[in-house]
Every structure is written in C-alpha cells, then in structure tokens.
C-alpha cells in the first residue's frame, strides 16, 4: 500500500442515517478469572448494516461476538466488565431475560449445525417452541424463511428429507433459515463460510447482503476479501484490543493504524 494515501487520523465515518443498535462500553473479558481476552472495548454498531470483525486467531473477535448474546456465560469463572447495550438496554443487567435475548439475537456457527430432523422441522422448530401451533401459519413461516435463505427452490420437493442429506452449503443456508424464522433483531455469524466451497461461500455472501434489509448482521471472518465484499463497517482486532473501526472502504483503502495496514496487506499475522 502506498503510504502517501494513508490518512493517519480519519474520524469514524457514520454518515449513513442508520441508528446505533448495539453500544459496547469499556468492555473487558477474562476467561477462568485471569486470562484476559478483551481490553477496554468500546464501539457502536448501526442497525441494518453488516459489521465484520477481522483479525488473527486469538484476537478477541469471536469472544466479543459471543458476548452479544451472552454465550460466554457458560465459561467457568469468566469475568465480564463494562456494558453492552442493545436498543438502549444493558444486556448484562440482572433483569435481563436470557431466553428472550437469545431469541432476539440469532447465531450461525462456523460449522453447519442442522438439527437431526427433516428440513421442514428444522425451520419449524423455533416457532413451534414459541407456541405456534396453527399448521398453516407454521407452513407459511417455513416457506417464507427458506425463500429468504435462498434455499426454497432447491428443497421444496424434499422438505421431509433429513437435513443431513443436504450439502454443506445448503445446510448452512438451512441454519440461517432456522435462525431468521425466530424474527431476531440481530444475526451473529461466526465464520459462516470457512467450511464451505467457493460457490457455496458466494451464495452465503449474497444472502448476507440481502438479509441486512431486515436484520443487523455482525460477522466474524478470517477472510479479509469477504469483509471487503459484504461489510459496511469493519473492526480490526489484535491481541484482545480493538485496533481500528470504520467504514469498510476506509479500513481497506486508507487505514489509520500501521497494524491495520500490515494486517490487510499480509505483513502481519
């Protein structure tokens, strides 16, 4: 990268009109009481955008992602400090309903994880669990979300087949359909294409771009090109610290921090 084009201190570009949905304030996180994974993280994530977290393994990006739906609560002797506000409410307050929080915040994991049941029942599972009993309504939910996940045309004649009969890419889109069937406000994606072939990856990326119209998406990825293709905003993490956060086009064309520049140009792992 030509150092002449680098602006050393660009201000955070929040020129779009989307309101802030997630606010992270001075967050520290420790595993097992003494292994510090995050150092004083503060950032805001805008509604109906795709925000990518990039950085090498162990940089803290997945740890922060999992704090958004409190998945790290299960870690023994973990310590959380700071605040995470979603729609203005501190999700780490004692009054937080964890079940509702995880309904409002869907999660798609690195490895496709369909339930051991039919394609249809995978998507119907969540709504049924929330009390939806009307068969026509369940049918409409299944069809709608398989279409939104760009999977309907491939499975419409085989809805009663096992989800495990699908390819890896199809399974991941099924997991996305299952997640969005719960009508979450936020969709978290932790390396959703790392186990997929290039064609399946392309389909997931197209889907991410479409889904931000209805959801706020936070994506962890090791692939910088993927962040450049799909993300509106990108945050670069290193050793538990947020090094730089801005619009993706700024991060990739004129990063303010030398560490960011080194990472995106391949000089830093």
Swiss-Prot record:
Its EC number is 7.3.2.1. It catalyses: phosphate(out) + ATP + H2O = ADP + 2 phosphate(in) + H(+). It is a peripheral membrane protein. Its main location: membrane. Part of the ABC transporter complex PstSACB involved in phosphate import. Responsible for energy coupling to the transport system. The complex is composed of two ATP-binding proteins (PstB), two transmembrane proteins (PstC and PstA) and a solute-binding protein (PstS). This is Phosphate import ATP-binding protein PstB.
């Amino acid at each position: 990268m030509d150092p002449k084009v680098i602006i050393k201190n660009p201000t955070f570009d929040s020129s779009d009109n989307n309101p802030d949905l997630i606010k992270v304030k001075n967050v520290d996180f420790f595993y097992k009481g003494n292994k510090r994974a995050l150092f004083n993280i503060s950032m805001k994530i805008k509604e109906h955008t795709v925000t990518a977290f990039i950085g090498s393994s162990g940089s803290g990006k997945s740890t922060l992602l999992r704090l958004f739906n409190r998945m790290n609560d299960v870690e023994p002797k973990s310590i959380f400090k700071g605040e995470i506000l979603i729609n203005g409410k501190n999700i780490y307050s004692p009054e937080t309903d964890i079940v509702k929080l995880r309904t409002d915040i869907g999660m798609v994991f690195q490895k496709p994880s369909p339930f051991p049941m039919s394609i249809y029942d995978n998507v119907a599972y969540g709504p049924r669990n929330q009390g939806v009993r009307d068969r026509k309504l369940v049918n409409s939910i299944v069809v709608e979300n398989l279409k939104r996940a760009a999977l309907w045309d491939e499975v419409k004649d085989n809805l009663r087949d096992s989800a495990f009969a699908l390819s890896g890419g199809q399974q991941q889109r099924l997991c996305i359909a299952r997640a969005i069937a719960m009508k979450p406000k936020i969709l978290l994606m932790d390396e959703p294409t790392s186990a997929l072939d290039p064609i399946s990856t392309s389909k997931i990326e197209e889907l991410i771009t479409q889904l931000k119209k209805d959801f706020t998406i936070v994506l962890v990825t090791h692939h910088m090109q993927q962040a450049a293709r799909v993300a509106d905003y990108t945050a670069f993490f290193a050793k538990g610290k947020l090094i730089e956060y801005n619009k993706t086009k700024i991060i990739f064309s004129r990063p303010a921090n030398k560490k960011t520049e080194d990472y995106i140009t391949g000089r830093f792992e």
